[in-house]
Structure formats: structure tokens, C-alpha cells
């Protein structure tokens, strides 16, 4: 085969390839590429518009900022609760084993002695100056009313270095057997609760004490019936 015929065959093969590329399959490939390019261009245009008008990007940053601002009051509230929980508080109950005398305990279930509060010689010692809610309840009982009722006294006193003596903060007087006396019936068992509570400005080192004139008539059946406490406000 001559060189000229070989060159002619190559030219014919090249022409055949070009015709195939211009055929239906080649046209489909070109159309597919054109559509893909159009979609990519449209997508890029939409993304640019969203970024330009702040629909995405800056808005998410603003939402993040708003969320942080909303969290600030919650954080401040949590810190406030932590500070409040650091205030002195005490809740004492009567020792059920010391029936006949009023002795307080603060190291058993359902009692509190926190943040500096102390129980010394049956007195509650305050660790700091400020407003305090002071409270106490005593429950008295008797088997028979009899002809004469008992005059029950319940009081909370404060001993401070300024006065060098006990000063009464709260006091209450009750008469036992009131219901039986009103009914004028047969003698029966009686129960009389006496509750005290008040808010006072107290001083660091003040001592609070509960007194009653009939400790032998206190009802020690349940620990929640006789209690004494103070809460810093």
C-alpha cells in the first residue's frame, strides 16, 4: 500500500468520526451539557441573590445573637438563685427522745442548718445581720380537761449583745379545753396548736430561743408537730 493511499484512508476515517459526532448521539451529549450548564448558572444566580439580600448567612448570625441575648436573663436568674441559696436557713424539730422537755435537733431527717446557722445550747445562733423570717409551732395535748383549763404560753425570744438580756419577739397565749368548755360535755382528750411567725431585723451573733410554760403537755407523737426555724430574706 502506498503512502498516498494510507493518508487517504486516515482522512476518510477522520471524516467518518466527525460525522458520527455530529449525529443524534453527539447532539444529545451537547444538549445535556447545555442543560447542566444552564442549571448550574441558575443555581449560582439564586445563591448570589440570597446572599445579597440577607436571606441566608447574616440572618443565621442574627438568630444566633438573639438566642444569646435571650439566654442572658436566664443566666442572671440562675446566678440569683445560687446567691439566694447561700443565705442562712434553719429548720429544727423537737427531740422525740426528750419527751417532757423542749430540746431542738438539726441533724436528723427533715431538718436544716445551712450557711452558717448554728444550734448552741438549744439556741439558734445567727451568722449575719439582716432580715429574718422567724417561726415556730408547738402542739399541746391533755388527757382530760378537768374543771380548770391550762393557760398555755408559747414565745420566741432574742438574746443580743446590745441588750444583754432576752427580748420577746413573738408570743401567744392559748387556753386548753376550749372546745370542751363550750360544749359543756364529758371530759375528753384535747389538742391545742400554737403557731408564731414574724419578720425581724436581726444582728450577727443574735441567739433565738423558744420557751413554753407547759413542756410536759407537748405532743411528741410526730416530728412535724413541734418545730422552730429562721430564714434569711
Swiss-Prot record:
Cited PANTHER family: TUMOR NECROSIS FACTOR, TUMOR NECROSIS FACTOR FAMILY MEMBER
Lipidation positions, renumbered (N6-myristoyl lysine): 20
Cytoplasmic topological segments: 1-35
SS bond partners: 145-177
THD domain boundaries: 88-233
Record family assignment: Belongs to the tumor necrosis factor family.
Assembly behavior: Homotrimer. Interacts with SPPL2B.
Gene Ontology CC, one term: cell surface
Modified-residue entries (Phosphoserine), positions: 2
GO biological process: extrinsic apoptotic signaling pathway via death domain receptors; immune response; positive regulation of canonical NF-kappaB signal transduction; positive regulation of extrinsic apoptotic signaling pathway; positive regulation of NF-kappaB transcription factor activity; positive regulation of transcription by RNA polymerase II; regulation of biological quality; regulation of developmental process
Keyword Heme: no
Processing after translation: The soluble form derives from the membrane form by proteolytic processing. The membrane-bound form is further proteolytically processed by SPPL2A or SPPL2B through regulated intramembrane proteolysis producing TNF intracellular domains (ICD1 and ICD2) released in the cytosol and TNF C-domain 1 and C-domain 2 secreted into the extracellular space.
Protein's job: Cytokine that binds to TNFRSF1A/TNFR1 and TNFRSF1B/TNFBR. It is mainly secreted by macrophages and can induce cell death of certain tumor cell lines. It is potent pyrogen causing fever by direct action or by stimulation of interleukin-1 secretion and is implicated in the induction of cachexia, Under certain conditions it can stimulate cell proliferation and induce cell differentiation. Induces insulin resistance in adipocytes via inhibition of insulin-induced IRS1 tyrosine phosphorylation and insulin-induced glucose uptake. The TNF intracellular domain (ICD) form induces IL12 production in dendritic cells.
Stated name of the protein: Tumor necrosis factor
The UniProt record lists the keyword Transmembrane: yes
Listed GO MF terms: cytokine activity; tumor necrosis factor receptor binding
Residues at the site labelled Cleavage: 34-35, 49-52, 77-78
Topology in the lipid bilayer: Single-pass type II membrane protein
Keywords carried by this UniProt record: Cell membrane, Cytokine, Disulfide bond, Lipoprotein, Membrane, Myristate, Phosphoprotein, Secreted, Signal-anchor, Transmembrane, Transmembrane helix
Location of this chain's protein in the cell: Cell membrane
Residue intervals annotated with topology Extracellular: 57-233
Transmembrane region(s): 36-56
Amino acid at each position: 500500500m502506498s503512502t498516498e493511499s494510507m493518508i487517504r484512508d486516515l482522512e476518510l476515517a477522520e471524516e467518518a468520526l466527525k460525522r458520527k459526532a455530529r449525529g443524534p448521539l453527539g447532539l444529545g451529549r451537547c444538549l445535556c451539557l447545555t442543560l447542566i450548564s444552564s442549571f448550574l448558572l441558575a443555581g449560582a444566580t439564586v445563591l448570589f441573590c440570597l446572599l445579597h439580600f440577607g436571606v441566608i448567612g447574616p440572618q443565621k448570625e442574627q438568630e444566633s445573637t438573639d438566642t444569646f441575648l435571650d439566654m442572658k436573663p436566664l443566666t442572671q436568674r440562675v446566678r440569683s438563685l445560687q446567691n439566694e441559696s447561700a443565705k442562712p436557713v434553719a429548720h429544727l424539730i423537737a427531740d422525740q427522745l426528750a419527751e417532757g422537755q423542749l430540746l431542738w435537733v438539726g441533724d436528723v431527717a427533715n431538718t436544716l442548718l445551712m450557711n452558717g446557722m448554728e444550734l448552741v445550747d438549744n439556741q439558734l445562733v445567727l451568722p449575719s445581720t439582716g432580715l429574718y423570717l422567724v417561726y415556730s409551732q408547738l402542739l399541746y395535748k391533755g388527757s382530760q380537761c378537768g374543771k380548770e383549763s391550762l393557760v398555755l404560753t408559747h414565745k420566741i425570744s432574742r438574746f443580743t449583745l446590745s441588750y444583754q438580756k432576752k427580748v420577746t419577739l413573738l408570743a401567744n397565749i392559748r387556753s386548753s379545753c376550749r372546745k370542751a368548755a363550750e360544749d359543756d360535755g364529758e371530759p375528753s382528750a384535747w389538742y391545742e396548736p400554737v403557731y408564731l411567725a414574724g419578720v425581724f431585723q436581726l444582728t450577727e451573733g443574735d441567739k433565738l430561743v423558744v420557751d413554753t410554760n407547759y413542756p410536759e403537755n407537748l405532743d411528741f407523737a410526730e416530728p412535724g408537730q413541734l418545730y422552730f426555724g429562721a430564714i434569711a430574706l
